Design a protein with these regions (language model features):
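Conserved, structured core segments of small domains
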Residues: 1-102
Length: 102
């Protein structure tokens, strides 16, 4: 099952992110979870990190929460909120509407 995990960073969280970035990356690389998509959310200027998003393929919601709980960012208090939502990939990993037109 696919789950979307959306974590919102605390406004003063950049120091926490910086301090635990290497451990976060190592956790993601070592995780047995099938991570389909992952990355930070950013402000409109694309400069400041505002949170993180993951789409993971796991057996159930409990596994998605356990994956997120094990992330050093979560464990060290970077996030002020988190949502875990079941996700349906209607594109099956392919662009749904063809290539973007300029």
């Amino acid at each position: 099952m696919l789950f979307l995990i959306h974590c919102t960073q605390k406004p003063d969280g950049q120091a926490i992110r910086d301090a635990h970035y290497d451990a976060h990356r190592a956790y993601l690389k070592a995780s047995p979870v099938d991570i389909k998509l992952a990355g930070p959310t950013v402000d409109d200027a694309g400069e400041a990190r505002t949170g993180s998003v993951f789409i993971v393929d796991v057996p159930d919601r409990a596994a998605a929460i356990a994956f997120s709980d094990g992330d050093p960012f979560t464990a060290n208090g970077l996030f002020e909120s988190r949502t875990v939502t079941r996700f349906l990939d209607i594109t099956r990993g392919k662009p749904a509407f063809g290539p973007a037109k300029d």
